[in-house]
Amino acid sequence: MRTFALFIATALAEIVGCYLPYLWLKQGRSAWLLVPAAASLALFAWLLTLHETAAGRVYAAYGGVYIGVALLWLWIVDGIRPTAWDVAGVAVALTGMGLIMFQPR
């Protein structure tokens, strides 16, 4: 459960770090948004180091959780409800994440 929670926190840090520059570039918001964006991306990188598994495996498995969190962001922040296809894609990605992270060692 700790691994999954850490992946969720990591995904949120990455999404915020990328969303804030999007607001600046696409919606004309303040360039000052780049300061918390940089901090959020630094947090993202640091959170990835907290996993006890090899870095490549962590990055591969993290992708599955990122997809799920990104679709929640789509729904909550952007106000767009994910489709059944989106949900199926997340299920496949999370299955892959589980296979990678929780394999017998």
From Swiss-Prot:
Keywords: Cell inner membrane, Cell membrane, Membrane, Transmembrane, Transmembrane helix
Pfam families: UPF0060
DNA-binding among keywords: no
GO cellular component: plasma membrane
Membrane-spanning ranges: 4-24, 30-50, 60-80, 82-102
NCBIfam families for this protein: PRK02237.1
PANTHER family named in the record: UPF0060 MEMBRANE PROTEIN YNFA
Protein name (database record): UPF0060 membrane protein Ajs_1326
Biological source species: Acidovorax sp. (strain JS42)
